[in-house]
Design a protein with these regions (language model features):
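Short, well-ordered beta-strand segments in beta-rich or mixed alpha/beta enzyme
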Residues: 8-16, 45-74
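Glycine-rich beta-strand-turn "strand-cap" elements at beta-sheet edges
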Residues: 1-8, 47-56, 83-108
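Short phosphate-engaging motifs
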Residues: 21, 56, 78
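N-terminal first-folded block
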Residues: 5-39, 44, 48
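An amphipathic, aromatic/His-enriched active-site/gating alpha helix that lines ligand/cofactor pockets
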Residues: 4, 31-44, 63-96
Length: 108
């Protein structure tokens, strides 16, 4: 009998960071992403990029193994620390639900 695996949860977080806070924000984001990927088996991928012409516009492609893993991620100490420390830095946040067309990662 083949077990069905839940579909991954994929979303794009669109953030606008206060321009004068960008230098302080980036290491906090990096710390949160590193901890999430290293410590949470259900966090399959977190990739952050900045728009070239507007570096205060950050986009994060998030991939979680399941909805349960996403919800667990939101309760982790490292995510709660990130949210607390960056709350005054984030000018706007929009979570966009997306459907994966093709997700591939080259390891190594």
């Amino acid at each position: 009998m083949i077990e069905a695996h839940p579909a991954p949860i994929v979303r794009m977080a669109e953030l606008e960071i206060e321009a004068d806070q960008l230098e302080a924000y980036r290491p906090l984001l990096a710390e949160e992403i590193e901890a999430s990927v290293a410590m949470e088996p259900g966090v399959l991928m977190l990739n952050a990029v900045a728009l070239r012409d507007d570096p205060a516009q950050i986009r994060i492609l998030e991939v979680y193994a399941s909805q349960k893993d996403y919800e667990a991620h939101l309760q982790t100490p490292h995510f709660l620390k990130y949210k607390s420390l960056t709350s005054g830095m984030v000018k706007a946040l929009r979570l966009v639900e997306v459907d994966p067309v093709l997700l591939r990662t080259k390891m190594g």
